[in-house]
A protein has these predicted regions:
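Acyltransferase
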Residues: 20-25, 54, 246, 271-294, ...
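Structural helix-boundary/capping segments
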Residues: 33, 111, 161-259, 264-266, ...
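Short helix-loop capping/hinge segments that flank enzyme active sites or metal/cofactor-binding pockets
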Residues: 69-89, 248-261, 302-357, 369, ...
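Short, well-ordered beta-strand elements within core beta-sheets of diverse protein domains
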Residues: 9-15, 93-98, 209-216, 332-337, ...
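Short glycine/serine-rich loop/turn segments
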Residues: 69-211, 263, 370-387
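Small-aliphatic-rich amphipathic alpha-helix that forms the alpha element of a beta-alpha
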Residues: 355-358, 387-411
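An N-terminal boundary/leader segment
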Residues: 1-50
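Residue-level signal for inorganic ion chemistry
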Residues: 27, 49, 221, 258, ...
């Protein structure tokens, strides 16, 4: 059962050929089997998940099918508030924190009948791309347990990749959905800034924070996005923009114009990733009407750190010892950026977001490698100095948080050592339907799920 896609499992559930209880039990058994090695979950909602599954089974048997997520086990990154369930942010500071309200995306998932199976491990407070710095221990890559799963949504990516859940919700401030998706061989989508509510999600950098799905294929990604996307009038960053039928859009056959962004995204690539990109570009050429080389505007670099410090200053000033070494050092470094530099960077960010749409005049979509390098070992990650400059694997993902553009990572090959490689595709604001449609075409052409 764990190898089924959301779409496949949903069809079987709707036709009453399998039960939500059996599906959930299968995931719980997989968690019991694999989580001691992978460390993808911080909290497994065992009893609650089974109760949700039994409720879903009763409704479906009575003919009250809520939609494609009804009865499907879904995981949540452990900085997304869940009423009555620990939400730790992978930090000693919040090790016993229990929210009283659900995040908006949790409310939407519950309304859709999803079975929330547990809270997933991450980089402490989501600041970093390894998931090796967690109060609850590092997340291990399913393809090589000595290597990082990526981050900060590493637990979510690893859980989906191993069938511990059918999909997951992560957050992405500099690549934290797309980079672990690439490292774990799955699909990860960062929607347009404001497309998915962040209310009830512990912030990292509010100007750059996005919430998005991680799934094993593009169809499942579309189904999960359909449920969590939409305006939230209580979230000041939420965009009031129309929602497309994302699953239906996958069947639309077009040949878009593709923009290849060479600098700096194709520079200093690992040789095996470079080879995978060459092969992917050949396939993209067959799926597109034109392929051009495109330049993107530079992005300001002094936005994230001051915003992170602003979020944490009240905790850090009183309880610095409750932060892990990596997070503690990063917060100390953040104090070096003065207020004027931040204000100027924030103004530049607004200008970049207003102007970046111009790059889509000659093209419809942009393509880059998701990461320039494969995942490093957990030991290497732990030995690294806490500096954003050292996280080369986030170089290609970070700019798209600044742009706010919808961006997806999909599998496009493996290294000789069997480590997954990701292809990154981006489109104009609120073009998720077209983006998913093209990602689906690539997925089908390369026979990857």
């Amino acid at each position: 059962m764990n190898e089924l896609s959301i779409a496949e499992a949903s069809d079987l559930l709707r036709r009453k050929q399998i039960s939500p209880v059996d599906l959930t039990t299968s995931c719980l058994n997989r968690i019991e089997q694999l989580n001691p090695t992978i460390n993808a979950f911080i909290t497994v909602m065992h009893d609650s998940a089974l109760a949700q599954a039994r409720a879903a089974e009763t409704e479906i048997r009575a003919g009250n099918w809520r939609g494609p997520l009804h009865g499907i086990p879904i995981g949540l990154k452990d900085l997304i508030d869940t009423a009555g369930v620990k939400t730790t942010c992978a930090s000693a500071l919040f090790a016993d924190r229990i929210p009283t309200k659900d995040a908006e995306i949790v409310r939407r998932l519950k309304r859709a009948g999803a079975v929330l199976i547990g809270k997933q491990n991450l980089q402490e407070f989501a600041w970093g791309g390894t998931s090796a710095s967690s109060y609850f221990g590092p997340v291990h890559n399913p393809f090589d347990v000595d290597r990082i799963a990526g981050g900060s949504s590493g637990g979510s990516a690893a859980a989906v990749a191993t069938g511990m859940c059918f999909g997951a919700i992560g957050t992405d401030t500099g690549g934290s959905v797309r980079e672990p998706a690439a490292f774990c061989g799955i699909v990860g989508l960062k929607p347009t800034y404001g497309r998915v509510s962040t209310r009830g999600v512990f912030p990292l950098s509010p100007s750059l924070d996005h919430v998005g799905p991680l799934c094993r294929n593009v169809i499942d990604t579309a189904l999960l996005l359909q449920v969590i996307a939409g305006h939230d009038k209580l979230d000041t960053t939420s965009a009031d923009a129309p929602i497309d039928s994302y699953a239906n859009a996958l069947q639309v056959k077009t040949k878009p114009r593709i923009g290849i962004v060479r600098a700096p995204f194709f520079e200093d690539l690992d040789t095996e990733i470079e080879h995978a990109m060459d092969e992917a570009l050949k396939q993209l050429g067959q799926l597109s009407s034109d392929v051009l080389e495109i330049d993107l505007p530079s992005t300001p670099g002094a936005v994230q750190a001051p915003e992170v410090y602003a979020v944490h200053s009240k905790y850090f000033s009183t309880s610095p010892e409750l932060y892990g070494p990596w997070m503690r050092e990063r917060l100390k470094q953040a104090t070096a950026i003065d207020r004027v530099a931040y204000i100027e960077a924030r103004q530049e960010l607004d200008r970049v977001r207003r102007s970046v749409g111009d790059v889509f005049s000659p093209v419809d979509l942009l393509v880059t490698p998701t990461t320039p390098v494969p995942p490093i070992t957990i030991r290497e990650a732990m030995d690294m100095s806490p500096s954003p400059a050292g996280e080369l694997w986030l170089r290609n993902t970070r700019p798209f948080n600044a742009y706010g553009l919808p961006t997806i990572s999909i599998p496009c090959g493996f290294t000789r050592a069997g480590l997954p490689i990701g292809l990154q595709i981006s489109g104009p604001n609120f073009s998720e339907a077209n983006l998913l449609s093209f990602a689906y075409a690539f997925e089908q052409a390369t026979r990857r799920r």
